[in-house]
């Protein structure tokens, strides 16, 4: 039985009243800004362009500047920046000149977490979905958590919310090692994979050691929740000197799933926990990777005393996260329609998991993928993996690499990827010129019953809504909210 969790008043940050975010529209920044607005702070922020995110923050009282200029930061008591912000940014330069503190976003998140019962979700893949599932289950258990998520939680219509309880659930970002700022009570490690390796000087051992260091930020009475199915997590487990709970499909796991059945968008499975009755669970997401995300959630909810009824309710009622296998609707084609799906996956492991989920849930349907690689460096470092995984589509269209501020790297572009995939002999990918309209290219390739997946972390994210509105797909049916 969960005890009533009274909200703990957030102590004020000394003389800080006005907080300025450089790049406030970013997915990692806007959520923290929204929570701070709800706590009563004055919030301002700048970004290169206005967006629905900045408009939402403006409606809550934030002052938004389009473009980066020195005067934007002139009245701030502190600047919050992400790792994407150049140190030469005029607002940052002005703050440093005026001795205004400049802090990374993770340090501000850590400040919000300092006086709360923090639950931090780390791992190369699955952070956003696991964090979102936790928010849903905690809410179903009556705990009303504060949450900061790297994606839009469909049920809440936002990626952040100030709750009334002492719980704060957030993603822990390893991409720039900033998760070391966090000192949670509970930490999850979903998996550890080679990504963002420039942060770790190309040394995978350094990445592993940093995850261990993150887990040792837990107090001695905290809890590390670790996926035993991931070989790297299993490898570092003996080094973790904190209480641990393991989860996975492995028979050795403390909390494990058996009897997994996938039916389209729904996945059903049985959960086995030590010294407890089996639990029958359903989630509205396809794929074994989402079963693992649900198991991490169940492990924490069980430890926090949330009832089985609330766990089942929170998982079955979960409505998903924006761009995580988000079904937009049906596009009309000759003889029927095509299911249009949008997904954020931008690492070969994530692409493979989604392809496997599609094959499991819709085994008789063709999979047409429009994919945009994210960063030249990632494309270079994981090139062979991309070639192998993307070659498993039935039809593949490749957009040019989304640079994310990087300069092109010879041999790490989408034309070269097309060439390498073609050489495997399984399919003939189509290269999409930068700026080309997608609808006329993709429509002739589609057949009734296909699944059309738009995938990647760049501007490919705008394609699904564009296709829904395209005159070439007049009569497209929008997916109804659950």
Swiss-Prot record:
Its main location: cytoplasm. ATP binds at residues 123-129. It is found in: Cytoplasm. Its EC number is 6.3.2.8. The keyword Cell division applies. GO terms for biological process: cell division; cell wall organization; peptidoglycan biosynthetic process; regulation of cell shape. Pfam families: Mur_ligase (PF01225), Mur_ligase_C (PF02875), Mur_ligase_M (PF08245). Coiled coil: none annotated. Keywords: ATP-binding, Cell cycle, Cell division, Cell shape, Cell wall biogenesis/degradation, Cytoplasm, Ligase, Nucleotide-binding, Peptidoglycan synthesis. It is an enzyme of class 6 (ligase). GO terms for cellular component: cytoplasm. It catalyses: UDP-N-acetyl-alpha-D-muramate + L-alanine + ATP = UDP-N-acetyl-alpha-D-muramoyl-L-alanine + ADP + phosphate + H(+). The keyword Cell division applies. GO terms for molecular function: ATP binding; UDP-N-acetylmuramate-L-alanine ligase activity. Pathway: Cell wall biogenesis; peptidoglycan biosynthesis. Belongs to the MurCDEF family. Cell wall formation. This is UDP-N-acetylmuramate--L-alanine ligase.
């Amino acid at each position: 039985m969960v005890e009533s969790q009274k909200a703990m008043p957030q102590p004020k940050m000394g003389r800080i009243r006005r907080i300025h975010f450089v790049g406030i529209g970013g997915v990692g920044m806007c959520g923290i800004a929204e929570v701070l607005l709800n706590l009563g702070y004055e919030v301002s922020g700048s970004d290169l362009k206005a967006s629905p995110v900045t408009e939402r923050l403006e409606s809550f009282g934030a002052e938004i500047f389009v473009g980066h200029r020195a005067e934007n930061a002139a009245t701030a008591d502190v600047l919050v920046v992400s790792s994407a912000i150049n140190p030469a940014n005029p607002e940052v330069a002005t703050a440093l000149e005026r001795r205004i503190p400049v802090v990374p976003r993770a340090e501000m998140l850590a400040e919000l977490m300092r006086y709360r019962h923090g639950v931090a979700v780390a791992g190369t893949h699955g952070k956003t979905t696991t964090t979102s599932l936790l928010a849903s289950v905690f809410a179903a258990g009556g705990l009303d958590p504060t949450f900061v998520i790297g994606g839009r939680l469909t049920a809440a219509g936002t990626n952040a919310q100030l709750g009334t309880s002492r719980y704060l659930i957030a993603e822990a970002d390893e991409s720039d090692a900033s998760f070391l700022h966090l000192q949670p009570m509970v930490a999850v490690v979903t998996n550890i994979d080679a990504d963002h390796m420039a942060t770790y000087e190309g040394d995978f051992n350094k990445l592993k050691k940093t995850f261990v260091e993150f887990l040792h930020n837990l107090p001695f009475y905290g809890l590390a929740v670790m996926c035993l199915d991931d070989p790297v997590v299993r490898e570092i487990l003996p080094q973790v000197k904190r209480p641990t709970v393991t989860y996975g499909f492995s028979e050795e796991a403390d909390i494990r799933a058996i009897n997994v059945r996938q039916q389209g968008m729904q996945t059903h499975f049985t959960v086995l926990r030590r010294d407890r009755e089996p639990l029958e669970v359903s989630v509205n997401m396809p794929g074994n990777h989402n079963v693992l995300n649900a198991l991490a959630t169940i492990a924490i909810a069980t430890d926090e005393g949330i009832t089985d009824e609330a766990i089942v309710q929170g998982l079955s009622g979960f409505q998903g996260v924006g761009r995580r296998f988000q079904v937009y609707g049906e596009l009309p084609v000759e003889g029927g329609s095509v299911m249009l799906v949008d997904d954020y996956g931008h690492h070969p492991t994530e692409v493979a998991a989604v392809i496997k989920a599609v094959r499991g849930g819709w085994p008789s349907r063709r999979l047409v993928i429009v994919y945009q690689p994210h960063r030249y460096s990632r494309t270079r470092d994981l090139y062979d993996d991309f070639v192998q995984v993307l070659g498993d589509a039935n039809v593949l269209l490749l957009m040019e690499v989304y640079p994310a501020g990087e300069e092109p790297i010879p041999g790490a572009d989408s034309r070269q990827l097309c060439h390498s995939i073609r050489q495997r002999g399984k399919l003939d990918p189509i290269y999409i010129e930068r700026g080309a309209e997608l609808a006329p290219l993709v429509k002739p390739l589609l057949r009734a019953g296909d699944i059309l997946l738009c995938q990647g972390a760049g501007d490919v994210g705008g394609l699904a809504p564009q296709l829904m509105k395209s005159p070439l797909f007049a009569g497209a049916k929008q997916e109804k909210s659950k």
